[in-house]
Amino acid sequence: MSKGQSLQDPFLNALRRERVPVSVYLVNGIKLQGTIESFDQFVVLLRNTVSQMVYKHAISTVVPARNVKVGPGGGYVQSGEGGQAGDEADE
């Protein structure tokens, strides 16, 4: 597993498990909102009034509506503008 995914998967999984509302900004500037229903190596399934399959290569930023604890002993990822990831932790 690459270093980039050692935080990505636990982060997305925590958002999915806790049903945290997220704003997903795409590289073209479009903002999508909803909850993460599922994800894999290439796509994120975002649910609002409908489900949207969004390719990860099109995603610029994922902003949770509240702080999310990543992994069992991991740090928190802060919500809002300028949030920073906490300590990395694998599940």
From Swiss-Prot:
KW RNA-binding (keyword) present: yes
GO BP terms: regulation of DNA-templated transcription; regulation of RNA stability; regulation of translation, ncRNA-mediated
Sm domain sequence ranges: 9-68
GO cellular component: cytosol
CDD domains for the chain: Hfq
Gene Ontology molecular functions: RNA binding
Keyword field: RNA-binding, Stress response
Gene3D superfamilies: 2.30.30.100
Pfam family, one: Hfq
Quaternary structure note: Homohexamer.
Role played: RNA chaperone that binds small regulatory RNA (sRNAs) and mRNAs to facilitate mRNA translational regulation in response to envelope stress, environmental stress and changes in metabolite concentrations. Also binds with high specificity to tRNAs.
PANTHER family: RNA-BINDING PROTEIN HFQ (PTHR34772:SF1)
Annotated family: Belongs to the Hfq family.
Name this polypeptide is given: RNA-binding protein Hfq
Organism: Stenotrophomonas maltophilia (strain K279a)
